[in-house]
Amino acid sequence: MAQQQQQQLQQQQQHHTSSINNNNSILLLHQQQPQQQQQQQLDQLQQYNNNLYSQNYNMEEYERRKRREREKIERQQGIQIDDRETSLFGEPRRLTEGDAEITAALGEFFEARVYINNQTVGISRSAPGAGNPRLQPNLPPQAKSLGHSPSSASSAAGPTSASATTALPGQQQHYQQQQRPPTYVKQADNKPPYNGRGGYPGQPMKNDIPSSSGMAPPRGPPRSSSSNSNSSSATNNASSGGVPANTPLGPPLSTQMPNGREKSFLGPPAPALHNGTGGGRFVPPAASKRPGVGQQPPPPEKDVNKIISDIANIFSVQPLTSIAATPHAPTRENYNLLAPNKQKYAMDIPSSPPSAEPSSLMTPLFTPIAPLVTTPPQASQLPLGAATSGTILAGEPLAPLHQLPPTPPKAASGVTSPGPTKPLKTEKNHSLEKQDSCLENDLELSESEDEQRKKEGRSAGNSSNSSESDSSESGSESSSKNDLQHHPNHQQHHHQLQQQQQASMQQQQVLQQQQQHRPQPLTSNGAQNKKFRHEIIARGSNTITGLLSSSGFGSGGSVGPAGVNSSAVMGAGSVSGGTLSSGGSSSNKTPSPTESNKWNLSRFFHKPANQTNSESVSPGNVSMKVPGILPGGAQIIPESIDVTTAIVKNEKIHDDHMAMEEGEEEDDDEEQQMRYGGGLSVTPVAVKKEAIDAVSEMALGAIPKTQIKRESAEALLSARLSDSGTSASGSSSSSSSSSDSAVGGEVVPMPGPGETFQLPGVPADITTVVRVPPTQSQKAPPSNSVTLTPILPLPTSPKQRQKKPRKKKAVTSAPILDSSDDDEPPPKHPGLDHSAVSVQAQPATDTVKKGRGRPRKQQQSGGSGNLSSASAGSSSQTKGPTLTAAKKPLAKTPLAMSRARKREHSSQSSSNGNTPTKKVATPVLVAAPLKPTSVTAGSSSSDEDSSSSAESSSKSSSSSSSSDDTETQNTNCRIVKLNKTGAVQKKALLGSGSSSASSSGSEPEDQTSRSQVGSGQALAQQLPPYKQLPISQHSQHLSSSECSSSSGGCTAVCSSSSGEEDEGRREKERERKPKSDKNKISTLTRIFNPKEGGAKKQGQVVIVDLQEEQQQGKLDAAAQPPPPHAPPAAPAAIMAKPRMTPTQQQQLGAGLASPARTTTPHLTSLICKIDLSKLSRERIMRLKKLTPAQQNGHLTPKDQATNAVHVPNGYAGDTNPAAKVKHEHPVKPEPELDAGYEAKFKPGNVKQEFQLKQERDRDRERERERERERERDREREQPPGRRRKRSSSSSSSPYKEKKRKKEKADQLQIGKELLPVPVLLPSNNHERMPNHDRLSYDKLQLLHEDAAAVIGDVSAANGSPTKKLLVMSPLPPPPTVTVAPATCNEAVQTTPPSATTTTATAPPVPATRLIYRSYFDRDVEHPSDDLRKNNQFLQEAINRKHAADLERDSFNQVTLYLEAVVYFLLTADAMERCSSEQATNTMYKDTLSLIKFISTKFRPYQQQSTTNIQHETHNKVAILSLRCQSLISLKLYKLRRKDCRAIINGLTDFFRVGRGDIANGNTPSSISPSNSVGSQGSGSNTPPGRIVSPDIHNMLCKQNEFLSYLNSAHELWDQADRLVRTGNHIDFIRELDHENGPLTLHSTMHEVFRYVQAGLKTLRDAVSHPTHQSQ
């Protein structure tokens, strides 16, 4: 052994990097023995054996000899470890459960198997950070070590535990392996493809050769190792030292550590990989693959021995602590046969900075923190990671984490230097790859075949991807998605091991696990929520921030971990927002149900195309359509889409969205916990656990106590809101606010609507996003406080949390709330839970409000105050289920029964609307709570889901997609709520309206909006005292009806109302009182009654069947407004809600009808087209004024837009009173609808919009004549009610009128000013701007808001001022993108200009408003003449070109080539000024040749159907390529234009003069007289011709060349245009045009560069998060 170790030491010295990394991994694995393993003797080996490495160490002599022989042969042959990587194990080593060595190293396999079977069955990857090596092949070879670092991060718990206990790392590693082991067991038995096991592809026989066999590598570990290391190198550079050891890939430090060959591979392979990488930035996929194969668990025997000996030898040099982080790598490899090699590979990637994202994903619950600390890429996470790592771990895990961070530095110092050369690169890739494969496989429900295929495909594809971009690029992101999802499970398992090893940790996390275990079964049951979770994870993984946002509770980097911790006690998530989430969730998800869920979720995660991004979210972040629901809302998009379908049927909407969430409340909540567990793992635990507060505090250790408290209470709501996946932050905020009040969470003071409140350890951006003024609103008193919890994108997971906390909190906060709240918690609808919490929170804020609110809810029949409070409570609960829930309490059904019934009611909610009407008191509560929920939770529970996801997306860059989807869902929720409200409208409306008004009255700020939600009940009680109540009710109506759908809108209303609240409320009251119940009833009836105006196909408003009943109920409520103030509020609410529903439905119908996704068909209820014409234009304008003012200007409209988006028709006004007063909102949602609902009203669909608009215009023109008369009468009789119709809040319309009259000019000015200053816009735009003047401004603002619609919705709900400010901040950029929606809104708002335009579809105005840069207004690019900079461009181009040459994944290769092309273009552009014309011409020609070569890569895909996502992405790349070719050809022509002119002039003269001899048989040739004899015979046969001089011939040739360039430029451009149309990629191009300015034949090379880079980034995000893309 000693000799062996020495030999290995020598080998390691040769490949010191790999060796050191391996040693570090081993040492880390054996952290228990902190002593430097200078002893190279069996003692150390035994120690390693005792630890996870004992198995490797206790290799039989036969195995050792074989390994030595292998190493000898490799050394002789110069075979690098890379080659040996081919085979994971020198020989397919079978690890029997009774294997003594394995037992010694990993502990009893039975125990491990218990974890694997029970907790990690679906999870093959144990290293969350390690797992997407193929995503990270792009990263430099060093990345391997870093890639390993993420693996270490995932195994961070191991290192941490190692520090604390040697057993812990072993167990952790075992745990991680358990995740893979189940797969390993299966695949070991069933299929070799598992990627590593025996040496299927690369048996002991020369790992080199088998390494490339692709068995495991195809999966991605081998390529991953190389790629992964690159991608994570940056991240792991810091953590490589500690992390690599700590990575699950203990042996994999050398990538193939597990195999006997791996050890030797450590030395040479890394260099080989590095060389193959060609500079290390882009590791060749093949090289990575080989390591991956070699690193597969099967080879651990020899590799382990080698590693052990190397560790003994090398470790003596390096402190044990450095190696301590590697403890569980061997075990992981041994057990995770399917993708253990990935972990191995990942394990050794100490210096893989690019794995910032992968690291997050890979980091285990505990280990992630260390990677955070060590990984620079996760800078945002790092602060939290370091500070929060302990906290996040919920205490005990924290200690190991803290230990781990110190260890990574050592590892970084000792291991990082050597590691980067080879192990870093290889191992990092492996770890990432492993994660990816494991994640994918696990998500695939451990279907070995699918796993193998996915792993192979993924290893090939992802490793390529990873080479393309560091950890966050397309491959890496895609991998990250999986990693996130997988890692949650993996982390869970790992975390569980740690917990078992560490008593206290065990207890805390066991509880979490138990809590999560409960949800996990549900998770498997609820596929929808899983989808959300996966989507969120996918979105989050796009970027670290996105990861944090989507996964981490506090998502934005530092906040992400804190938030995650709050949500989930597990701190591992802290490292990577996603990872933490997944870590926290992992405890919950660890149960077998979770695994199955994860598997399913993984599929859903990948299958649902598109982020967002934005994605990333990735809000996202995704993708990076910031506002798009798909990118940001991608998390929710699956549900959103479902919800959309549900929206079609109000009943179904309630059911699908609400029922999904309520009906599946437990399942969904748990599911979402499980699902988002990957991202929100921690949060779900806290939420799920009744001891959430304690857990939250532990998890939120890094977060301020206030935040933690809030998170605990808020986490429940926030979790649910987050769970919806829509702007987790916004939704979370909303939830948080309620939770805060209810749970007693502290509220952090908020500077102001435009300001960013600062939370300790929380990034400003997150804080801004959170913008929890609405949350504070719930907590009416602290209007300037913000709840930190909302920051979570994790909230997806929090759903579960919310559910349980809701029950707890609801019961605890207010027994009164118990009946409704408990019922609601059972529904587990995020919205409901949130509502319940909201109400509770309000009571917390206002004990009287809450206690009275809920009880009054029960006492609803009581006075208006009771109704109002009940309404507020109901508002909180108001998701479709809320209504049911409210009824349930009346029915006195048990909570369990309530849940079941609620689920049933969710589906029946539409029809049940009548029941609420009958039980007006309870329904009122439901109805009112509905609004509060939306305000508090950003949306209702179902809305919340879509809203949160959409919002995060909105934050990213796919605002339109996200927003659309969110809005659709919101609309669904809204419609359902409205319907329910309608049914319960008598008192529900009163309660909701009055409570809203009260809330507004008590809190003028946006927070009042929340207050209205939560304290709306109390306000309802206060209703009589507050005359502001009308306005407040207006806000509340927005909150209840619209806020459910669009929490942002409600918040905005409140915020807006704050300044104008008194005035608005007074006007509202005046309006409401003047409005007779008759008018309201008639209006509502017209809107909702198919027999009346509503169903005359005027507005295409889809009305649920229940709506009629609800209308009646609303009418009844309007007719029976008990309190003096409440009656007006109730009528306003009634009208608003019914109106809102029609408007929303209209927009849904219109927005969805035009696109393929038409909610109308789904809607079982009538399709009623409501015309804004019904509402007087003046009123609309007034409503705009008032609504925006009360709703924080356009921000609220934007939030409302999400809800009102579906109500583009004139009824936006009517509906808006309850749902959303702002017409802008109806328009805003259109962009969101555009993304979510195929952008019916989006500018992209201008034609559709115009057609719809024309149709609606014709219908509405006819209807408007009638409606105008009616509305005029109503205005005279009931100005407030109708205004309410106009605006979300009925009381806002009078105020708007005043504002319009007083500040018409001011508002225009302010609007203009506000546009630049988005933050100001929300509060003042609508208030100050006159209707028409403000319409234009509103359009722009709406466009901005649309872009930030998702954020706005969530934000508005969470904190109207802050969120709106945040939303508005994005607004200025989005205008171009969201112009169409804004236009639609504007059209709606500009009802006076054209009745038709008043409907949601008002493209004409927006069309004129579409903002494009003028050709003469272009920013003049003054490229630097600095040669150094030009050389930098050239170097970047060359690097990408070489990386693309080595890339194996077709998409990654093509994108890398295209990136190289644009860099070459920048170089050529610079050469135009610095170099000769010929050199420049040559550069362009060469570039054109290169891009033509690239185009050959697209052809196979272009000719195939574009239904395939891969083909679509290739087609989009082809479009960008054709554009580049066209512009290059044009540039080549322009460069020679002077020559061309001279040639043309010369040729013109030549042809004009007719010079030239006629050559024919009769004329001897003067040129060749000697040939005359020979030519005489045939001369007569030659046709007459003209003899031209050589000069003329040359000129003709040159002219042909130059003009061919010109012709090609136009031809290629036309080809691109055709491909855009035939491939249906218009939205993609339009989005790029809006974001980067249109690409034209006049574009400069710098503009081409920006445009193409943006397009490639979007495509990578889409590939990383296919769910976003698909949607």
Swiss-Prot record:
Instruction: Tell me which residues form the DNA-binding region.
Output: 849-861
Q: Which residues carry this modification: Phosphoserine?
A: S446, S448, S819, S820, S869, S871, S1360
- Region span, Disordered: 53-79, 126-304, 393-599, 723-761, 774-1162, 1185-1311, 1562-1586
- Stretches of Basic residues bias are at 487-496, 800-810
Q: Where is the composition biased (Basic and acidic residues)?
A: 70-79, 424-437, 1063-1080, 1224-1241, 1250-1280
Q: Which residues carry this modification: Phosphothreonine?
A: T416, T1362
Specify residue ranges for compositional bias: Polar residues: 588-599, 774-786, 907-917, 1009-1020, 1188-1203
Q: What does the UniProt entry say about where the protein is found?
A: Nucleus
Kindly name one Pfam family recorded for this protein: AFF4_CHD
**Protein name as catalogued:** AF4/FMR2 family member lilli
State the gene name recorded for this protein.
lilli
